[in-house]
Amino acid sequence: MDTHFSAPALRDTLAAAARAADAATLQRVDAQLDVWETQSAYWEALLAVALDALGNTRGEVPFDTYVNARRLAMIRFKNGISKYWRARIVNRVAVTISREAKARIRTRLLDVLHEPDRAVAVQAAVAIARIARLDYPGEWPELVPTLQDALVQAAAAVHAAAESRTLAHSAAPTLTLLHAADVLRQCLKEFES
């Protein structure tokens, strides 16, 4: 396992965790991921792995390993928000996610509205809500209007499919509708706590 951070090393490490059958391997992988958390590019790379539903098209790793690596990446991302979204000191080193990186992350997170894996989508909805608690409306004023637009457009597409009796072909708008509603529900839940 490569100990220097890079996006490919992160993918390999997450895949190793996804196929690990023993506690020692999981502990080693977890320790490596903990070290990388302080790297500035780690959070965007982690999110890229988590939301890359088509990244294993050449079958480099078994499908179930790839899916589990994506899920693990999203869970680690979600769990790191409360710890690293705001600047902090870790082992006497300032850990900061730049404003530009945060903006890219917020934009990329909304790709979850089209996420085919339910487990990734659920964890991403919680991650969005945690970030929204800190950044909405100041840094992320477009969050609620974007979710509202997604809900309206997806509902209209589902309705049109139902009227034309092609509801079986409306899986993508239905998925978007469900995910947008789930993200909004998680945000409201986070705002009221």
Model-derived features: where do they sit?
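Compositionally biased, intrinsically disordered low-complexity segments enriched
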Residues: 153-163
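Basic, Lys/Arg- and aromatic-enriched nucleic-acid-binding interface segment
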Residues: 173
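Alpha-helical solenoid scaffolds in large eukaryotic transport, assembly, and signaling factors
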Residues: 2-151, 176-193
